[in-house]
């Protein structure tokens, strides 16, 4: 737009000069004068309102939360834990069974809360699912849970395709 306003100003000057009248000062169409407030005027206006309409939802009355009457909330009463409760006393009981216990007992044999197809498995998701399918296909699992069985089959098929397409294999020994 500046080229348009400059062109109009030039045309006006040319017409005014050719008419013989006094030339008027150039009027800028894009610039407007803004008067800056002095420091005293800004202070007189009061504080600048920022984030209008935002309400702080936190306590602003001190470090600890306060009640409406201004008193601090009391510290909770200290109740020591019972170190000899069953849960705490037996925590980690099988951690060193292979060092301290019988040589013939492997730590995998003491994993009681782990499903049989997952006990002692090391491998990626595809290998774990293949092992699960091999162990569960002869049981009632496919009939009792057909949706989960189908989802597992679909996941195995997807992983098979993905691993064959996207992963590198080593050099062939042939």
Curated annotation (Swiss-Prot):
Gene Ontology BP term (one): translation
**Localization per Swiss-Prot or TrEMBL:** Mitochondrion
A single GO cellular-component term from the record reads: mitochondrial large ribosomal subunit
> Chief localization class?
mitochondrion
InterPro entries referenced in this protein's UniProt entry, alphabetically: Ribosomal_mL51 (IPR019373)
Q: Which UniProt keywords apply?
A: Mitochondrion, Ribonucleoprotein, Ribosomal protein, Transit peptide
Q: Which Pfam families match?
A: MRP-L51 (PF10244)
Q: Where is the transit peptide?
A: 1-46
Q: Which GO terms describe its molecular function?
A: structural constituent of ribosome
Signal peptide start and end residues: none
Can you tell me which family this protein belongs to?
Belongs to the mitochondrion-specific ribosomal protein mL51 family.
What PANTHER family does this protein map onto? LARGE RIBOSOMAL SUBUNIT PROTEIN ML51, MITOCHONDRIAL 39S RIBOSOMAL PROTEIN L51
| Quaternary structure (record) | Component of the mitochondrial ribosome large subunit (39S) which comprises a 16S rRNA and about 50 distinct proteins.
Q: What is this protein called?
A: Large ribosomal subunit protein mL51
Instruction: Please report the organism this UniProt entry assigns to the protein.
Output: Drosophila pseudoobscura pseudoobscura
């Amino acid at each position: 737009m500046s080229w348009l306003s400059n062109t109009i100003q030039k045309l006006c000057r040319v017409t005014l000069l050719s008419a013989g009248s006094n030339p008027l000062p150039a009027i800028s169409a894009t610039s407007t004068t803004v008067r800056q407030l002095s420091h005293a005027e800004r202070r007189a206006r009061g504080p600048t309102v920022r984030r209008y309409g935002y309400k702080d939802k936190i306590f602003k009355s001190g470090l600890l939360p306060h009640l409406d009457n201004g008193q601090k909330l009391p510290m909770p009463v200290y109740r020591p834990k019972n170190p000899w409760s069953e849960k705490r006393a037996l925590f980690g009981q099988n951690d060193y069974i292979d060092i301290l216990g019988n040589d013939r007992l492997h730590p995998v044999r003491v994993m009681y809360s782990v499903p049989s197809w997952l006990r002692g498995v090391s491998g990626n998701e595809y290998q774990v699912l293949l092992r699960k399918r091999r162990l569960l296909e002869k049981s009632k699992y496919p009939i009792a849970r057909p949706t989960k069985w189908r989802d597992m089959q679909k996941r195995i098929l997807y992983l098979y395709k993905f691993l064959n397409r996207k992963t590198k294999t080593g050099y062939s020994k042939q």
